[in-house]
Design a protein with these regions (language model features):
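Arg/Lys-rich, glycine/proline-spaced intrinsically disordered segments
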Residues: 50-51, 243-251
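Secondary-structure capping and boundary motifs in well-ordered enzyme cores
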Residues: 32, 51-56, 97-100
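Short amphipathic alpha-helical "interface-anchor" segments enriched in bulky aromatics
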Residues: 36-37, 142, 146, 257-260
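An N-terminal domain-cap segment
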Residues: 37-58
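Alpha-helical support elements that line or immediately flank enzyme active sites
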Residues: 58-70
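Charged, often Cys/His-bearing segments associated with DNA-binding zinc-finger transcription factors
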Residues: 1-34
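Short, intrinsically disordered, charge-balanced linker/junction segments flanking boundaries
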Residues: 227-230, 251-260
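Polybasic low-complexity intrinsically disordered regions
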Residues: 2, 65, 74, 78-81, ...
């Protein structure tokens, strides 16, 4: 049982609980933490050399916050400091320790990716979200963002990492990778992530972001031409494309009511 803090006692007297806090409490109850920690444990640093690593469950909870709320590494760290609900979910008592920094989260995420655990957990999370009614399906918002990296970045073989590439966005040249995401239009939660070199065009990956039962896809002008080019053959049933549009206001309102 997590130790109660002064903030916990203070917040326990509130008249209402936020939807976000309620959602995180449900996730806290239904996720098999011991089982998931056991999956990661064989791959996690032992701490025999150097500074002792942060606890596996702590890092896993932080990683899940990043996925659910589509946060950057720095944004996740900041959110734990800013949000009582997120701090409570992670289980940090600021009288005893600080939140893990963005670099620590980055290393943890790379460890999961290295051993293929990120997809295992991501798929498991999506199943939990659908089963509990927090992800309704039917509509997806597609988007992409460039993850910058120094041009000198090398891989484990001391060679230029082939997964990183140079691309031009507007009048600016960027180097790194591109993160393509599919977001549930009803809840605002990320359901699919694909990572490519930065020079891969958005529409080349779109088919991987669309779920089998999606009926409508929303995207900005970068996705013009989707469904009309052989490079991106939509694998699923007929899908309506709403480019440069946001989901209907009633859907956005529902997402805000559930997770705002």
């Amino acid at each position: 049982m997590k130790q109660q803090t002064f903030s916990d006692f203070e917040y326990s007297n509130r008249k209402r609980k936020t939807k976000r806090e309620g959602f995180l409490e449900i996730m806290d109850e239904i996720i098999p933490w011991d089982e998931w920690v056991g999956i990661i444990m064989p791959f996690y640093p032992s701490g025999k050399h150097g500074r002792p690593p942060k606890g596996i469950e702590l890092m896993l909870r932080m990683y899940l916050l990043q996925i659910w709320f589509n946060l950057s590494d720095e944004g996740t760290e900041d959110a734990i400091y800013d949000s009582y609900a997120m701090r409570k979910f992670v289980g940090i008592n600021f009288l005893e320790e600080d939140a893990p920094d963005a670099t620590t989260l980055l290393k943890f995420r790379r460890l999961l990716e290295q051993h293929g655990l990120n997809k295992l957990f991501f798929d498991a999370i999506n199943r939990v979200m659908v089963e509990t009614g927090h992800m309704l399906k039917g509509g997806t918002v597609v988007d992409a963002t460039i993850i910058n990296a120094p041009p000198s970045t090398k891989n484990a073989e001391k060679q230029c990492d082939p997964e990183m590439h140079q691309t031009k966005k507007g009048n600016e040249w960027r180097f790194g990778m591109k993160c393509h995401i599919g977001v549930d239009a009803f809840s605002g939660l990320v359901h699919t992530i694909e990572v490519t070199p930065a020079n891969v065009h958005d529409i080349q990956v779109t088919s991987k972001l669309i779920r089998e039962d999606d009926e409508v896809v929303y995207g900005d002008s970068g996705y013009l031409g989707i469904g009309e080019t052989g490079r991106d053959r939509i694998r699923h049933a007929p899908v309506r494309h709403r480019l440069s549009h946001q989901p209907p206001p009633e859907q956005l309102a529902e997402g805000i009511r559930q997770f705002g």
